[in-house]
Amino acid sequence: CSRIHIRKLNGTREIFKMNYDTPTPDIRLYPAALLGKRYAVSCDINQFFPSIYTHALDWALIEKDQAKKNAQGKICQWSHDIDRFSQLCTNRQTHGLLIGPHASNLLSEIILARVDEALLMKNADYRFLHHIDDYTCYTESYEEAERFILDITEALRAYDLSLNEKKTSIAKLPTTLSTDWVRRLQLLRPQSKTIRLNDVVHYFDEAIGMTLELDNNCAIILYAMKVLAKLTEHMEYRAKLYYFEMSTHLLFLHPYLIPHAEQQVFQRGMNLLDITSFIPILYSQAIGQRDNLTCAYSCYFAAKYNGTLPSTLCDDALRSDDCLFKLFAYWFFKKKNDAGGVKALYDDALALSQNAEDFDSNWLFVYEALNVNDLDGKWKALK
C-alpha cells in the first residue's frame, strides 16, 4: 500500500503532507508487515517522474486495450483529457510529469495503484509499502524476496517504468525503520531549554560530517537546518547568529537548499541587512555557474526583501533564455520601478508571443509580462 494518503487537509490547500520530523500514523503499519518475515526488499523506481508516460495514465484508468481505442476520448473522455492535459504541462511531451506539484503525486498514484494491484494478484501474501517511488517488501525467504523483484519489474514494465538496479537490495531482518543518519541526528538534537552556541556548532558539525560520509547527501544538511530552525526561539544570541551565518554559508555551497532558504532561515528572525547582503553574493555565484533557478530565486528574494542586484541583471536574464529567470527579473524590475528593465523584458515577451512554440515554452513569463490586449483567445480572457 501507499504511504501517500491523498486527502483534504484542514487549514491548507495541500492534499498530503511529507514530514520527516514527526512519525505519521503510517508507521504503525510496520510491525504488522514485519510479523513472520525474515527479509526486507528495497526498490526504487528509476527516474520516476521524468519517466512517466502520459498515455500510461489512460492505460491505468481504463485498461491498456481500451486506452488504445480511446483516441480523441471516444471511449472515456475524462481519462483522455488527463493524458492530454498532462502533456500540456510539459510542452506537449508525452514523457515526464512535473516534479513538485501535488497534482503530479496524485497522477503518479493512479499508475502505482495499478502496480500495487498487479503485485497482489501475483501474490496476495506480499506485504509491502511504497512512499512515492520507494518500495519496501517484507518476505519470509530470500527466494520470495527475489520473486518480488521480478514481479515488480514486470508490473512496472507494463507502464514503461523500470527499477533502479543500483538502489535495489535485499537485507536480512531485523533492520532499522529510520535511515541511519536520521536516527543519529534525532539522538543529537539539542534538548536544553536554552540552546547555546556549542549546541548549534556541534549539531551542524555532525550533520556536515555525515553529509561528507554519504557522498554529499544534502538531504542531511536540510534535515539539520529544519530541526534547528524550529529551535531558533530558544537559542541564545550567539547561537542564533551562528545558525544564520552557517545556514547562509551552506545555502551558498549547496543550491539544492535554496528553495528552503526563506522558510528555514530568512523567516526565523534573520537580520534584514544580512539577508540583503547575501542576495547579490548568491546571484553572482549562480550567474557564474549558469544556475538559472538560483538566479530566479535571487530575483525573488531581492524583490521581496528590497535587496539589490547587479546592473547586468536584464542582459543576464535575456541571455539565459529561461522562463522563470526572466519572470522573476521582470517582477524585480516592477518592484523597483525600473522602467528600462520592464520595457526590455516586455519586448522579449512580446517577441516570444509571436511564435507558438516559443510561447508554449515561456507561457508563464509571457502571460505575466504582457498586457491584456497583447494576448489572444483564452489567454486574453484569462488575463
Where in the sequence are the language-model features?
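Active-site-proximal segment of RNA-dependent polymerases
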Residues: 1-40
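Short, charged low-complexity intrinsically disordered segments located at boundaries
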Residues: 3-18, 83-88, 141-149, 181-186, ...
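Conserved polymerase palm-domain catalytic core
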Residues: 31-132, 138-146, 194-383
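Polymerase palm active-site segment centered on the conserved acidic dipeptide of motif C
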Residues: 142-198, 202
